[in-house]
């Protein structure tokens, strides 16, 4: 009888613990992004209103780390519930079985731009690599398109380029070399690196948004490849910088749920909120990055809308996320070898 009571007590305690854990799981989720102003805006636009409407606490974590995400999934100890990742990684991770499939009864995809939704991820936001330039350094010579980067006589000074092996730099080199936008893929790597060789000594590399802004605003770089939102922020601060949207290169971040996430249902609801017309518009209005939801456009601030990629659709070149998902790792090896030559 005593043993029976002890067993009952142990079982009761175990059930209580499980119930508490289930309650905790339902009441919180871990959101992971890149930090800085982007994650601050995601918190303000998505996490705070989501918590108010659902009573689900959103715990901020980061920065996004692809190796860590993979290790969590493979070990079966997944601590993250929603992760902001680059679009090409989202596709590659899905092919490797690292992500949960989305529930499209919860996440409404009918009004999501089809470029920015897949079976395992929905767009967080999209942005463009644009040609930014320092007006004080270049004077009346206003760069028009990516060919200007390679014309060091007309446009003297350093060129700022994104240093990571990801979509963007190789494409702009090929466009500047005369490749038509609809003939970019598969990338002619020999041709792209040969073109970059012509200005390699004039390149200053940036790895994050704040660094890119400093290079441009200070004039250390006369012109270069920049995230559109960072150039817009400089303009709002009165910096003497201009921008060309010709052949702006469209890239995106996706929101994904790691395979085995402990709070999958709450995470799915978070994705639905973040990708809604209101969620996307609120984030865009804070950052000058574009919404993936087509119904968000009328909700944008009147003075902001002309400064978003959505206003320059006719000049867009959408980077091929699927191509990079398949070939990115091989390209990265060659990229890193070229950098140190």
Stretch-by-stretch model annotation:
Residues 88-94, 217, 222-240:
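A ligand-binding cleft/hinge motif common to bilobed small-molecule-binding domains
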Residues 313-341:
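Conserved C-terminal helix/tail region of periplasmic/extracytoplasmic solute-binding proteins
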Residues 130-137, 174-178, 252-266, 282-285:
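A bilobed periplasmic-binding-protein/Venus flytrap-type ligand-binding module shared by bacterial periplasmic
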Residues 258-318:
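Mature extracytoplasmic/periplasmic domains
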Residues 36-41, 78-80, 84-217:
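Extracytoplasmic ligand-binding site segments that recognize negatively charged/polar headgroups
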Residues 127-129, 189-198, 235-261, 296:
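Periplasmic-binding protein-like
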Residues 20-25:
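Sec/Tat signal peptide C-region and signal peptidase I cleavage site
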Residues 26-93:
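Early extracytoplasmic/lumenal segment of secretory-pathway proteins
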């Amino acid at each position: 009888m005593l043993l029976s009571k002890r067993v009952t007590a142990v079982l009761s305690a175990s059930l209580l613990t499980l119930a508490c854990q289930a309650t905790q799981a339902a009441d919180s989720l871990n959101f992971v992004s890149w930090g800085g102003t982007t994650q601050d805006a995601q918190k303000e636009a998505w996490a705070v209103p989501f918590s108010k409407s659902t009573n689900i606490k959103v715990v901020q974590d980061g920065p996004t780390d692809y190796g860590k995400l993979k290790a969590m999934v493979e070990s079966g100890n997944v601590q993250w519930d929603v992760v902001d990742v680059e679009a090409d990684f989202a596709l590659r991770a899905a092919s490797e079985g690292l992500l949960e499939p989305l529930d499209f009864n919860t996440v409404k995809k009918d009004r999501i731009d089809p470029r920015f939704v897949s079976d395992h991820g929905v767009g967080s936001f999209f942005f463009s690599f644009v040609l930014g330039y320092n007006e004080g350094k270049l004077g009346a010579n206003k760069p028009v398109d990516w060919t200007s980067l390679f014309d060091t006589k007309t446009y003297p000074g350093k060129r700022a380029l994104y240093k990571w092996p990801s979509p963007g730099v190789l494409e702009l080199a090929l466009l500047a070399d005369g490749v038509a936008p609809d003939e970019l893929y598969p990338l002619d790597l020999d041709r792209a690196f040969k073109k970059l060789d012509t200005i390699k000594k004039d390149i200053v590399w940036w790895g994050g948004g704040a660094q890119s802004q400093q290079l441009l605003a200070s004039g250390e770089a006369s012109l270069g490849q920049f995230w559109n939102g960072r150039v817009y922020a400089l303009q709002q601060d009165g910096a003497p910088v201009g921008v060309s949207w010709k052949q702006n290169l469209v890239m995106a971040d996706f929101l994904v749920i790691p395979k085995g996430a402990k709070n999958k249902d709450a995470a799915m609801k978070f994705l639905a909120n973040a990708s809604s017309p209101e969620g996307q518009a609120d984030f865009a209005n804070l950052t000058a990055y574009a919404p993936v939801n087509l119904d968000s456009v009328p909700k944008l601030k009147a003075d902001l809308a002309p400064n978003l990629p959505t206003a320059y659709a006719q000049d867009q070149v959408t980077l091929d996320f699927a191509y990079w998902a398949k070939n990115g790792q091989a390209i990265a090896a060659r990229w890193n070898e070229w950098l140190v030559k």
